[in-house]
From Swiss-Prot:
It is found in: Cytoplasm; Membrane. Belongs to the TOM1 family. This is TOM1-like protein 9. Residues 9-138 form the VHS domain. SMART domains: VHS. Might contribute to the loading of the ESCRT machinery. The keyword Coiled coil does not apply. Residues 144-181, 270-322, 371-524, 542-561, 622-675 are annotated as: Disordered. It is a peripheral membrane protein. Its main location: cytoplasm. The lineage of its organism: Eukaryota, Viridiplantae, Streptophyta, Embryophyta, Tracheophyta. Gene3D superfamilies: 1.20.58.160, 1.25.40.90. Keywords: Cytoplasm, Membrane, Protein transport, Transport. Ubiquitously expressed.
Amino acid sequence: MVNAMVERATSEMLIGPDWAMNLEICDMLNSDPAQAKDVVKGIKKRIGSRNPKAQLLALTLLETIVKNCGDMVHMHVAEKGVIHEMVRIVKKKPDFHVKEKILVLIDTWQEAFGGPRARYPQYYAGYQELLRAGAVFPQRSERSAPVFTPPQTQPLTSYPPNLRNAGPGNDVPEPSAEPEFPTLSLSEIQNAKGIMDVLAEMLSALEPGNKEDLKQEVMVDLVEQCRTYKQRVVHLVNSTSDESLLCQGLALNDDLQRVLTNYEAIASGLPGTSSQIEKPKSETGKSLVDVDGPLIDTGDSSNQANGATSSSGNGVLNQLALPAPPVTNGSANSKIDLLSGDDLALVPVGPPQPASPVASDQNALALIDMFSDNTNNPSPATAPSGNPAQNIPLNPQGHQQPNSQAGEAGLQQSNGFAPQVGYSQFEQPSYGQGVSSPWSSQPAQQPVQPSYGAQDSTAFPPPPWEAQLQDYSPSAESGSPFSPGMHPTQTAFTHAQPVNNNNPYPQIPQTGPPVNNNSPYAQMPQTGQAVANISPYPQIPQNGVYMPNQPNQALGSGYQPQQQQQQQMMMAQYYAQQQQLQQQQQQQAYGNQMGGYGYGYNQQQQGSSPYLDQQMYGLSMRDQTSHQVASSSSTTSYLPPMKPKNKPEDKLFGDLVDISKFKPTKPTSGRAGTM
């Protein structure tokens, strides 16, 4: 039976030690020590097995019975040759785990059983034999169980206690342990904080060197309560699993430790401790925010320079306050300010001009709808009427050479190109010969003497809208992405006629001839009369001036001859509408009747350079299909007109150039695709 139990405890089928069977064997040996001989004999047999697992399980069982059983087992282990068998196995170089287990057991036993003069010297003899064989004993763990089990002081729990021996005199004294404290609750933590604050206030009010006040009953009681709470907090930290309660307990423990340390320092007579009691808490808050300067820029330079000298009451709040909203300065050097109500400025397209203001009370612009789909915007924003100057300088060339380019202000509409209906302000191509300015809603009131094209004595004073835009021409902006730069020697001719405004909406003054908004299409500048918006049809000659209207599509493709008859009929209606206005404004025309055409006929009469070389510089091209502005020509060049196919009217182009051959009374159908 005993051998069967040992066989089951050391079976090779086990994954690990069968502790239930091992303890059962120990109980059997403790109850019947006579069974120890058979058990030790069976274990010795299993130790000599060739299976390393069986050897390890047998060694584990041997260790268990040596530690848990009495002197009878120790004697049989020493006398039955178990130690000698273990030394022999080590010398045979067995499995590593088996060898290490044997070395640990022999080293432990030789120390426990007392050396060569002990009761059982076999343990020490086996240890010395292994040392002579060169075995290296591993270091023992200090947490290993002792070889001898301490004597039993209480009856086993598995057996019922002896009720007859029960009495007050037979009670076994319990070992002294740490006193149990009830777990701290949130309310008790708050109470402890209040007691700690009262003690801290009393300590801070003490005079330096006065130890008599420390003996007051109230202070002694507070110190005692703080020490008790500190012990309870330590117990709470070691036992609780609530994270929030643990966090508050740790914070309370730090505060209690600080206050008790200050109390002990005052009691020991250390100088300068009573005045430093409340400082650590406030300095801790400051150090988290302000080390060398404020972590958050509040916009106050004094706080940044002297961040450490701020008041203790508002120091932390000032550091944690959100920064004030930045103050926008529209007149500094901002490129665009479309949202502020005080400074309404448009983006200067060219390079920055330090000498010219961008946005001020005298230089305010009205915001217009930059993305309107129709040029005849029913409700454009207008500038205040009381402001005399309403244009910003957008032309660096005109600003740098105001005398030589006085005629540049009239370049709008001078070559017969105007914004196409249906495109926004940014999509409308601004050709090099001029486009009506969309940025001014009222004519300016500052007359300047410009140099007109003919420079004859019959020239009238400049119109008010040209006087303001003389030096600043948006269409001649060299850096504009929408219009190429203009040649410095260009001149154009303007008309000093008022705008014929028949619709209820305010008109946009143009640097060229005024605009008549009777039709949705713009007409070319005509001698002595206002100009309507674009019309994609050619104009009827009036007063000897041939005014061809050139739409955007004429630049990219030839005009269709089959539509000329219908267009001439429509132009006849326009001619009748303009006849009245022509008679009223006939006396205001310039000396040269061809000045409004914009091709430089007046310069040709003056003997100047060829008009094409001067007027075609920087002329940009726009294709109706792609809606993209072509790159400007960098040098003065002659751009030949795009000739439509199969047009018999090409022979009339000589009449346009030669003024002497021009017949004002006979209408001629001009080219629609000329530049």
